[in-house]
Amino acid sequence: MSYATKIHARYVYDSRGNPTVEVDFTTDKGLFRSIVPSGASTGVHEALELRDGDKSKWLGKGVLKAVANVNDIIAPALIKAKIDVVDQAKIDEFLLSLDGTPNKSKLGANAILGVSLAAANAAAAAQGIPLYKHIANISNAKKGKFVLPVPFQNVLNGGSHAGGALAFQEFMIAPTGVSTFSEALRIGSEVYHNLKSLTKKKYGQSAGNVGDEGGVAPDIKTPKEALDLIMDAIDKAGYKGKVGIAMDVASSEFYKDGKYDLDFKNPESDPSKWLSGPQLADLYEQLISEYPIVSIEDPFAEDDWDAWVHFFERVGDKIQIVGDDLTVTNPTRIKTAIEKKAANALLLKVNQIGTLTESIQAANDSYAAGWGVMVSHRSGETEDTFIADLSVGLRSGQIKTGAPARSERLAKLNQILRIEEELGSEAIYAGKDFQKASQL
């Protein structure tokens, strides 16, 4: 048995320059570390990220309370409990009972998750296996060759992530028409470089500047204009037919009075031009018919269930419809979405739920309903690569971790490259089967 002999938390900085929680978990095998990511938008149905709220330091975003909760409450209790690190479910159950609230608001999801993920790193080492193999074991993933995910790369930003009038938040490229992860990543990189030079040529030098997740953010007005630019980049790179396009609309951001305002960044926006759910669905259908769109995330607002259901009936057999704000990795919300037939894929963000065990449960519940699972980074990321191993261990077949730019994004993609090299012929690339990867 291997158990915690020392647990120590500190604050470090994320890719936005905000403090976040880092946990060192020590066992007889050494020291194992995890850093917690943070999202820009934090939904009402998410586990609570504990921030200090002291405006005189870090603009209120300090995490000293969460760090103290690890050092003063979790560490002594977990060390005393002497739980075998290999038993992730037992460790996470212990952390949940220590907190005792439904949304982890007592200790903070950022405190709990840091310990949960660091413990998983320790467990892999205790067994002398890579992290992704440990995750595959505890999630009861299908045996056989490991599946490497399609990298959904956010190459063009709009919405709340960017200036300009474009309402949709993310436009991603997904190199599905190739046979290896490394080839997919190379194609992604080449398309991205072509996109950057086209963007600068068309919109001026500063349009090549990158956003929080590495994508360009030119002053684009409409989704069509964005998609045309990406298609030009794919063509120019020479990969037409090999690269699909995905969008994260993040439509909750522009949902007002039951309508969708595609001009939401304009304070003088004309309410007579706002779209109803069915009208927005018409726009999506038009785009799907004109472009190689394989996946749309959050096409409607998180509580506009009717619009989701109506849209799923129309295109659910053609493309992947991903719930993020809709489901927030929350088992109850996922269950409702499955029952209502509102979507067919889950966006999995470990810090929305707060422990590894609950993240695995969310993925397995989704698989059981025939859904796909896309493992996702957050906009405030770090050099931590846990989600790369998570995506491989869960057989998710798809990962969303930004553009091939900025080290905190590349860290995950580079880790999957290493895993691909290590597995050799024991790995297959999800490719066009990304939505059904758990069954491959």
Swiss-Prot record:
Main localization category: cytoplasm
Record-linked Pfam families: Enolase_C (PF00113), Enolase_N (PF03952)
Reaction catalysed by this enzyme: (2R)-2-phosphoglycerate = phosphoenolpyruvate + H2O
Transmembrane segments: none
CDD domains documented for this protein: enolase
Gene3D superfamilies tied to this protein: Enolase-like C-terminal domain, Enolase-like, N-terminal domain
HAMAP family, alphabetized: Enolase (MF_00318)
Protein name, entry field: Enolase 1
Organism: Candida albicans (strain SC5314 / ATCC MYA-2876) (Yeast)
